[in-house]
Amino acid sequence: MTGGPTYLDAASSEPLHPAARETLLAALDQGYADPRRQHRAGRSARLLLDNARAVVAEALDVRPDEVTFTSSGTEAVHLGLLGLHRGARDGTIAYSAVEHSAVLHAATWAGGGVEVPVDRLGRVAVAAPPPGTSVLAVQSANHEVGTTQPVAGLAAFAGGVPLFMDACASAGRLPLPDGWSAAAASSHKWGGPAGVGLLLVRKGARWRPPFPVDERIDERAPGFENVPAALAAAAALQAVVAERDEVGARQRALVDDVRRRVAEIPDVEVAGDPDDRLPHLVTFSCLYVDGEALVTELDRLGYAVASGSACTASTLTPSHVLAAMGVLTHGNVRLSLTRDAAQEQVDGFLDVLPSVVARLRAEVGR
């Protein structure tokens, strides 16, 4: 191939959006001071932080006082989920079987939880949370197969149980659904800088700090605010939302093409809902092929893709998401498109994939 490597792993981290880069460079010389201080530099930093919060609130259609900047999406997940659990005072966390490991680890830390099953598309298969649930954790869309969840519908039948929504995979790409009490998002997933997460807590939600508080601007999250990074994250989110319809339609058409052509390869299964899904990603599994070997060979040919869930790939364990769905767990590839992905890049990937799969199968005698 020509033109350098093709990055097809935007679901792990989207390249920095031009709006984020421009804003970050400009803010580095202005947002360094402590926004709690009353001197001029501190007041300037506070104004910048408040502006970032207002931009995020408008982009996500929430109130500015419902927005808290955190140091990562994982921290936002832990704060949001465990804060609702603590606010409920008793009961057990319930979570869908396809949640990100950040949710699973938080539930374990809180004493364990109840797993809610999903169907073969990865969608929650129950109408109401189990008895004794303190908080129900359901992602807005799955980070591995893209299937969206009926968040508003689940909330309507939750019987007063608060709902925590992990929106890290979808924020900016899809409008936030209704019905949640707290939610989390991650800047680098939409083209903002890494190291910035969003904790969203609805006005009136029964949320209490699950960890020691800090006397900062916003007591929901501890630590010194990274004002330049927060501004850059807000600028990227604003830009991504503004271009969402055009970019999303283009990505959806490209992914539709991938789903169709990949399914033509013998013994390949495409996972997730083909329609109600994130526009930019698709996961498929190849029987008789090792996922790590497939990713390595594709990388050698210039195509960067992922295998398995990002939360389990480093441990070389099968994807708990695919296992919960009852589909193939090995030999899987997740392809996810950047905002500027081109038809030629996708075509190039699809041209080399069949021969790579055939060669790897031949090496193991299948």
Descriptions of predicted regions:
Residues M1-R366:
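Pyridoxal 5′-phosphate
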